[in-house]
A protein has these predicted regions:
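FabD-like malonyl-/acyl-CoA
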Residues: 1-156, 285-319
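Alpha/beta catalytic cores of group-transfer enzymes, especially the acyltransferase/condensing modules
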Residues: 10-12, 37, 41, 58-61, ...
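Glycine-rich phosphate/pyrophosphate-binding beta-alpha loops
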Residues: 76-78, 213, 268
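Non-catalytic positions within long, well-ordered alpha-helices that form the structural scaffold/packing
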Residues: 92, 198, 279-282
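Short amphipathic alpha-helix with an adjacent loop that forms part of the alpha/beta core around
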Residues: 163, 320-325
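Short glycine-rich catalytic loops that host catalytic nucleophiles or stabilize transition states
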Residues: 207-210, 279, 312
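A short, acidic, amphipathic alpha-helical segment used as a generic capping/interface helix at domain edges
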Residues: 267-283
C-alpha cells in the first residue's frame, strides 16, 4: 500500500466541522488549543458555530448561536488547517503515515507541516497572515470564481485570453483535474465567460462562493506583503515528500520555499499535475484529511482501481484506522 495524505482547501468548510472529534479525543482538543493560542482566535467556536471571537484560554463553551465568520477567507484557512492537523494527530498516534503529502491551496500548509518542512507554529501563523491578506488586499471591484466542467483547459485558456485582450479580467485559477478548471475574474467577465464556455461545449458551469479572484495577478499586493512574513520563517529539509501546487512537482532542498509560497497566491493551482505525479509514483491509497470530499472526488474522475478514504468525523476516522493499520 502506497499512501498519499491530501489536505482540502477553501470551500470545504462547514459549521460544526470537527466537533465530535474535539469532544472524543484529547489530542484533537490540544491541537485546537495550540492553534488558538498562536492566532488569538477561538478556533473551536469558529469551526463549530461559525463565530469568530478572541481566545481567552478556555475550553469550548457549547452554544446554539451560529454566525457567518467561517466563510470569510481570513478565518476559513486557519479553521480548515486546524481540523486537518488535529485528525493527523490521531493517525500518527496509530502509526499511520503517508509516503507523499499534498493539498489544495491552503491545504499545502498542513501538508508541509506533516512533511516536516514547516513547524506547526509557523504554519498556523503564516495561514493567519495569508488569509487576512487574501481577503483584505484585493483591488476594488466585484470578483467571482467559476468552475467549468467538461471543457478542455486549453479551450478555457483561449477564451480567457481573448476576453483579456478585450480589456476584461479573467484567468484560470485552479486546474482541478482534466475535465474541470476554475477561473477567477471580475464579475462581469465571469458572467460573459459563463455563456461563452457553454456555447463552446462546457457541460456545466458553477459559480463558487468565494470572496476574491484567488490565484491570479489581482493578488499581487497581497503576495508582496506576504513575502515579508515568509522571510521570517526557517524552512526545514523535511522527511516526507510534498508536492507543490504551482507546478505539480516535489519540493526539493534547493527550492526557495519563501518564493514558491508567495508565488502560490498569484499562480494557478495545478492539482491536475499533482494527480498525475501521484499516479506516476504508484500511489494506490488516497486519504483526504479534513472537511469535504473534493480532492478524492477529483481523483475518482481521473484514476481507476485506487482506494479513496475520507476522514472528517469520528466514524470516518475509526473506519480509516481499521483499513490503514
Amino acid at each position: 500500500m502506497k499512501i498519499a495524505f491530501l489536505f482540502p482547501g477553501q470551500g470545504s468548510q462547514k459549521i460544526g466541522m470537527g466537533k465530535d472529534l474535539y469532544e472524543k479525543y484529547e489530542e484533537v482538543k490540544k491541537i485546537y488549543q495550540r492553534a488558538s493560542e498562536i492566532t488569538g482566535i477561538d478556533i473551536a467556536t469558529l469551526c463549530f458555530n461559525g463565530i469568530r471571537k478572541d481566545y481567552i484560554g478556555n475550553d469550548y463553551i457549547e452554544t446554539n448561536e451560529t454566525g457567518e465568520d467561517l466563510i470569510k477567507t481570513e478565518n476559513t484557512q486557519i479553521a480548515i488547517a486546524t481540523m486537518s492537523l488535529a485528525i493527523l494527530e490521531i493517525l500518527k498516534k496509530n502509526d499511520i503515515n503517508a509516503d507523499i503529502a499534498t493539498g489544495l491551496s491552503l491545504g499545502e500548509y498542513p501538508a508541509l507541516i506533516y512533511g516536516g518542512q514547516l513547524t506547526f507554529e509557523d504554519g498556523i501563523n503564516l495561514l493567519k497572515h495569508r488569509g487576512y491578506l487574501m481577503q483584505h488586499k484585493l483591488p476594488k471591484g466585484e470578483y467571482s470564481m467559476l468552475a467549468v466542467i467538461g471543457l478542455e483547459s486549453s479551450k478555457i485558456e483561449e477564451i480567457c485570453k481573448k476576453l483579456n485582450e478585450e480589456g476584461k479580467f479573467i484567468l484560470p485559477a485552479n486546474y482541478n483535474y482534466s475535465n474541470q478548471t476554475v477561473v477567477s475574474g471580475d464579475k462581469t467577465a465571469i458572467e460573459e465567460a459563463s455563456v461563452i464556455f457553454k456555447e463552446n461545449g462546457a457541460k456545466k458551469v458553477v459559480e463558487l462562493k468565494t470572496s476574491g479572484p484567488f490565484h491570479t495577478k489581482a493578488l499581487e499586493d497581497a503576495k508582496n506583503e506576504y513575502i515579508k512574513e515568509l522571510e521570517k520563517v526557517t524552512f526545514n529539509k523535511g522527511n516526507v515528500k510534498v508536492i507543490k501546487n504551482i507546478d505539480g512537482t516535489f519540493y526539493n532542498e534547493n527550492d526557495n520555499m519563501q518564493e514558491i509560497l508567495a508565488k502560490h497566491i498569484v499562480s494557478p493551482v495545478r492539482f491536475d499535475k499533482v494527480i498525475n505525479l501521484m499516479k506516476d509514483e504508484g500511489v494506490d491509497t488516497f486519504v483526504e484529511i479534513g472537511p469535504g470530499k473534493s480532492l478524492t472526488g477529483f481523483i475518482k474522475k481521473e484514476l481507476e482501481g485506487v482506494n479513496l478514504i475520507n476522514i472528517y468525523d469520528v466514524e470516518s476516522l475509526e473506519n480509516a484506522i481499521q483499513i490503514l493499520k
